[in-house]
Amino acid sequence: MDGRVQLIKALLALPIRPQTRRWRNPIPFPETFDGDTDRLPEFIVQTGAYMLVDENLFTNDALKVTFLITRMTGPALQWVIPYIRKQSPLLNDYRGFLAEMKRVFGWVEDEDF
């Protein structure tokens, strides 16, 4: 018991580090995407803006694609599961992944967009 008391006293005597605040992304956290074609442009803009502002976190294509996947639900999530299972190269290609999403979910871009 005496050893525990000494250990607790020693731990309490250690200098306390000031708590550092984690940087907070000013862009609202993106809403989820369920495969609704009408919401796809909004989803891409929301996730893209969120990642752009926090470039220190989203440093490569794999992290960007992974972030998109974490925001998917329903049919969109079901669509991506086979890509994950077969470890598709698209999971490491952000632009390619976006192009495939647009193709699958039927978004035809206007040249003005």
Swiss-Prot record:
InterPro entries in the cross-refs: DUF4939
Note: RTL8C is one of at least 11 genes called Mar or Mart related to long terminal repeat retrotransposons. They do not correspond to functional retrotransposons, but rather to neofunctionalized retrotransposons genes.
Similarity-based family: Belongs to the FAM127 family.
Protein name: Retrotransposon Gag-like protein 8
Taxonomic lineage of the native organism: Eukaryota, Metazoa, Chordata, Craniata, Vertebrata
